[in-house]
Every structure is written in structure tokens, then in C-alpha cells.
């Protein structure tokens, strides 16, 4: 009887311990300490890019679908240059209302573009450790609005051998073409804001494909570099130069840096 009592006491103790064990909660699929799979649901970031024909700034919003796929949209502002743009030094050093500035000879317009793109990210190599790098393929397309701004120069009219001269800030036209393209009549670049209120819209489309390298995949912060090909096209030829062939389509290589956060 004594042995039976001892056995019953031991069994009672085991049962009591079993009742106090808290059942394990099911693990969430996405946890920061896992270092695998999707850790966040969306990204928000700002970036800058340099193209072989210009530069730009953009905002990116990304939704993470699963471990190897994301979708995003971007808004971008950029400037596109003609490949024949070459800065020229003014032949004048003083004598006018302003200090002479260098200018682009033959340039008649500047092109600024506001673009909206949507696209997808395909993760090619997942980052398994914090010290690793995630490589992804980004493809996107969208619509754009080009803003063609006149490129204005300060021109000299009159007899330069006398004091009977006049300085005029003008944009290119068929009436002043001979003076606008005469380096001896170009005193200076008029300035960035000249022609701002004479901008004309030019609708277009844009597409981009690139490889992205992200070395902060499992951190709250985003640090991503991307390299690839960008193509901008417009409804008509964009008149950027008076002395070179103008284009309707502008392909370019680019490199961009993007910084932001995940949540």
C-alpha cells in the first residue's frame, strides 16, 4: 500500500506539471529574427539617378507579394540632354549687364519630364544572411509628360565697334536664327529660369529594365543600387538643337541609388 501511494503521488505531480505547460503558439510566417522569407509588406523610398543623357529624382512605393516577387509604382522628375550638347565659353569677358556665362552652342530647348511608372520586381538571389546581397530584376513602364522649355541667350545687337549696342534676352526663332547661332553675337547664357513660363507640353511613354542590388534586405532601412536601360519616347521629335538631328526616342543607360524604409 505504501508503494502504491508513492506511485499515485508521482503520477499526480506529473499531471499537475503537464497542466501548467503553456501550448506553443503557432509561429508567424514572417519574423525579423528568422532571416528568411518575406520580412516586410511594403517599402517606401526616394532616389536619384544618373543617365548617360541626363539625371533625375524619383519616389518609389513597393508592395511585397511574396519572397521572390514585388510590385511597385514610381513618380520621377528628370532632365534629358541631347548627345550633341557641348558647353561653349563666351568670347566676351565683360561689358554687359551681367558677367558672361558659358552656354550650349546650338541648343534651342531644354527637356524636363515627369513620369509615372508601374512595374514588377523578380528576386533572382535571396539574401539568407544579414551580410549578403539580394539581386533582383526590375521591369517597369508608364506614361510621361515632357516639358519643353526654351533655352534663352543674351544676344548683342548693333555695331560692336561702337557703344551703339543693345543686349536682348531671346529664345531661338526663324527671325533671330543668324544672330542666335553667331558666337560673336552671343554674350551669355540667360539663366535657368528664363523661358520657364513659355514651356510647352510633350506627351510620351517610358520603359525601364534593370538589375537591383540590395544589401539591407532584412533591415528597416533600404539601400539599393540599380543599373539598367531606360527608354523615353515622345509623340513628336523634341526640338532640342538647331544644329543637329533631333529625336523622338531617347535610350540611355542609368545607375540609381534608392534610400528609404520597410514596414
Regions found by a protein language model. Name each.
Residues 40-44, 51-55, 69-71, 110-114, ...:
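Residues that define the transmembrane beta-barrel architecture of outer-membrane proteins
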Residues 32-41, 91-102, 183-192, 233-236:
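Flexible, solvent-exposed coil segments and beta strand-coil junctions
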Residues 77-115, 119-121, 125-129:
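Outer-membrane beta-barrel translocator/channel fold
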Residues 1-26:
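Bacterial Sec-dependent N-terminal signal peptides
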Residues 19-77:
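Short glycine/proline- and aromatic-enriched beta-strand/turn motifs that initiate or cap beta-hairpins
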Residues 140-225, 230-242, 246, 259-261:
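Outer-membrane beta-barrel transmembrane domain signature
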